[in-house]
Amino acid sequence: MRNLRGIIIAAVFVALTILLRLLGDRFNVLMGMAYPFASKTYMEIVGTWVGKFDFCLWQIILVVFCVAVVASIGLMILNRWNFFRWLGWVLAPVSIVAFLFTLVWGLNYFNKPIHESMKLEVPDWSVTDLREATDYYLEQANQYSVSVHRDDNGDVILKDLDTLNEILSHSYDNLVWEYSVFAGPRGPVKALGWGNLCSSLGCDGVTIGLTGEAAVNMNQYTATVPFTMCHEVAHLLAFAREDEANFAGFLACEYSDDMTFRYSGYLKAFLYCADTLYEVDVAQWEEVWEKASQELRHDAQAMNAELARWEGKTMETAGQIYDTYLVTYGKTEGVETYSDVTGLLVAWYIDQYRPDTEPETEPFDPTDYEEVFPTEPPQETTAPTEP
């Protein structure tokens, strides 16, 4: 029994983690009243302390753990330790971390949808709605694509990471004035270590709720970095679902005072909508792309080139693992949830930018004598009934 203690501890924490997820799913309305606030408060407190380090603390912890596991394998062989005892004490800390991760951040997957918090109506969109939204985001992206600073190769030039974090913070501050749901921690977003490894895994950014750290892979093409930073901070703001983090990241970019952030947000919004349009109507997709500016085309090609550079079995396997992780938290679409942001982007366009075709009616003015006591009787709007 002594040799199974670690395995028993691991099993207990796995069971507790599963129980937490079931409770979060079952009582999501009740939990949504307090959990997001508690989660954001925890990440703000821990993130403020961890933010003093330029490196990602979780990466250091991961390296130490991996080295300890490898060293323990050698010790197990030399000292002839019981295999199940060794396995238990490896699995125990992993299961404890998984439990704590779910406790302080993971239950955000069961929060109410972002559009409900924003009181944004998300209708079932048509191809016409999608085309209009795609055209709008392309128009905005075209406008900013010629305004951002570029180098001799035509690539977007970024400011240093500290300055980008300041801009990001102000961008979310602007957004909070309209929607208080975006109040909370702002990072700072760190540069992700092991950039080449992360690129081979298809990782542009990562947020670890347990340490309150958001990080961005600076190896990605520069035009997408501001959007990715805003996306990762959205995870700190308790938006766990990838489509909602994408939408929050776009809104932060749109509300930014910096044209590079705005361009990054509109570029990604256009690409998400265009990809969905391609799936439903290739001809319209081709028509849209014909209107793209040369600068935007250059950026899209640079993004594709960077992706092609790292594509392979490693990225495919990493995608499958992350897909499984999302499914375990109830996101049956897996990694496809990233592109689900299209519905939110179309809804935002309809709510904010689609021209209103209904005639505006003058509001009633109680101080206007003619309105209060009209000289002519009001016109009947329905046909009179026969006696």
Could you tell me what each predicted segment is?
Residues 295-387:
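Pan-zinc metallopeptidase signature
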Residues 149-218, 222:
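Auxiliary, metal-adjacent structural segments of Zn-dependent hydrolase domains
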Residues 54, 225-246, 250-251:
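Active-site recognition of the HExxH zinc-binding catalytic motif
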Residues 9-25, 96-101:
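Hydrophobic alpha-helical membrane-insertion segments
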Residues 128-133, 240-284:
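Post-HExxH zinc-binding segment in Zn-dependent metallohydrolases
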Residues 68-74, 80-116:
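Transmembrane alpha-helices and immediately adjacent membrane-cytoplasm interface residues
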Residues 15-76:
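Membrane-embedded alpha-helical segments of integral membrane proteins
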Residues 108-174:
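Membrane-interface segments at or immediately adjacent to transmembrane helices
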